[in-house]
Amino acid sequence: VSKNISITSEELNSTDMISIVSSFPSNFINHRSPGIPNELRRKILHQQYKNRIVSDGLETGHLQLTDNGYIFKSKQSFSSFAGFVFEAYLVDEFNSKRTARLRAFQWATERSEGWSTKTFDEYKAVGTGLLSTKTNYLGYYEPQSNADIIFLRKSPLLDIMEPALIYNQQVSAKIQVKSIKNRFKEDIVDKVISGKYLRVITMLSDNFGRPSWVICHNILHHMLRTNAITSDVYANTIGRIQGPEYFDLNQYYIDDYYDYIYQWYNGNESSTKHTDEAAEQEITGYKYVNNVLVPIDA
């Protein structure tokens, strides 16, 4: 007969207990459980995202190589920094996962189901604020523009790169990436309605765990019901705001990654620890493969 074994909060938070539990693979532990100690949660997030932040940090230019190894430098606000990191994350995901890139390309170029994908594989996702773009496609490097992600291919007629266009229009297909937890109407909905942003991927859930794209859609529903917008504006806007799951990306993974970025940005993750792990895991050995930053041994 099994017996319940009680454990106090103090015992659960003890160094020994954290060490014991931390020896298990991090994906075996639900770090979202309210009973998980903060220190253990930080360790789990660190284990899951340490390589990801190095890759994205190098790409955005916020992680720099010095005589003392890799260190984090940024004069930007946290929200701006997180935005650049998620821009790098999405570009990486789109270029490494054809299904996600195809969905994003179809959405951004406003193509209907059943369109020919014959030329699609010629295009790659490009982040307008990323270092690889500055190095390889300087003319498309615009870190302050209203487009975080575009799609480029080599022109079949000229030896130049050209952007994907919205179907039957001479307008570049553009995606804005938002990594915010509030002010969704002012910073997303209103700007899509006004035309400042063509399309937005809003990455995060709010502080209550509600996906921000759902909140944006609810805002549009309310605006329609109260006659703040017409049915035409509603129909034209709602499909232009999507979240990660629209592209088969995991919302929980992204929210957890955001938490890890936050604790690292605010100094809860030691730069020395990252430097040591970079040496141990040969994170210094990154290279560009099809303009995606990957480990050399990948």
Put a short name on every predicted segment:
Residues H62-T66, F72-D190:
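Catalytic centers of nucleases
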Residues V1-S19, N27, S231-A298:
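Non-catalytic C-terminal interaction segments of nucleic acid-processing enzymes
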Residues L40-R41, I188, I261:
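Generic structural signal of hydrophobic/aromatic residues within well-ordered alpha-helices
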Residues V1-T66, A298:
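Nuclease-adjacent, charged terminal/linker segments that flank catalytic cores
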Residues V54, T99, I193-S194:
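Generic surface-pattern signal
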Residues F84, Y141-E142, Y167-F247:
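Catalytic cores of nucleic-acid endonucleases
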